[in-house]
A protein has these predicted regions:
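Active-site neighborhood of HAD-like aspartate-dependent phosphohydrolases
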Residues: 1-42
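Short, surface-exposed alpha-helical segments at coil->helix boundaries
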Residues: 18-23, 50, 121, 149
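Conserved SAM-binding loop
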Residues: 14, 93, 113, 144, ...
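Asp-based, Mg2+/Mn2+-dependent phosphohydrolase catalytic module
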Residues: 1-4, 98, 102-105, 117-214
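A metal-dependent, Asp-based hydrolase signature
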Residues: 46-84, 103
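Short helix-capping segments at alpha-helix termini
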Residues: 31-34, 61-65, 128-132, 160-161
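Short, acidic loop-to-helix structural element flanking the phosphoryl-transfer center
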Residues: 2, 83-113
Length: 214
């Protein structure tokens, strides 16, 4: 076997919460009169909440905001987002993803989540994967967001697997960079795959089965 563990990004790989994020950020930005569209939203992929806020505030021309005010804005966005996440269910977990996860586990691989989101445990519970993974490294136990490799390095440590024996699965270029900086190979889907950011650039997560076999 080429790898002993697979570490998955959550959003855009296991499930998609893009639309929930977009609507929450847009509601916050609209309330402050800040222009916000899907082009700006695309820059937020794989980026932490506070770093995302700073990107949005590039278009803000009002009075200077204190750190406390910025924290309140980020919290407001998260409240809107978390409320919308209550609509998520196991139906938001694509069948091909669940089948691939089950197959990889059956092959004896350790499986983990590596996500910058502090909402990771809630989302996993909503889609029926609460407690399913061998390890979950997320925004609640890291201090640096992607492209810093911390989230993936911690996931590997939690699994007890050397970095070079871990495969990272990502859909964001910043996440692919994080995996590489952590000394891991990376398989990409979505935008990251289109940009050729991975060691393998996939059209479907099902390709992971052959990739991990080597």
């Amino acid at each position: 076997m080429r790898f002993d563990a697979v570490i998955f990004d959550l959003d855009g790989v296991i499930c998609s919460t893009d639309e929930y994020h977009y609507k929450a950020w847009k509601a916050m930005a609209d309330g402050m009169g800040i222009p916000f569209d899907r082009t700006i939203n695309n820059r937020l992929r794989g980026v932490s909440r506070m770093a995302s806020l700073e990107i949005i505030l590039e278009k803000y021309h009002g009075p200077a905001l204190s750190d406390e005010e910025k924290a309140r804005l980020a919290e407001q966005k998260n409240d809107l987002y978390r409320e919308s996440l209550k609509e998520m269910s196991p139906a938001d977990l694509p069948a091909e993803v669940k089948e691939t996860l089950d197959t990889l586990r059956g092959m004896g691989l350790k499986l983990a989540i590596g996500s910058s989101s502090k909402n990771t445990p809630f989302i996993l519970k909503q889609i029926g994967l609460g407690g399913w993974f061998d390890a979950v490294s997320d925004g609640n136990n890291i201090t640096r967001s992607k492209p810093d490799p911390e989230v993936f390095v911690k996931a590997a440590e939690m699994l007890g697997i050397p970095a070079e024996r871990c495969l990272v699965v990502e859909d964001a270029v910043s996440g692919a960079e994080a995996g590489h900086r952590g000394g891991m190979k990376v398989a990409c889907v979505g935008d990251a795959a289109k940009n050729g950011a991975g060691d393998w650039n996939m059209e479907s997560v099902r390709e992971l089965i052959d990739i991990t076999k080597g």
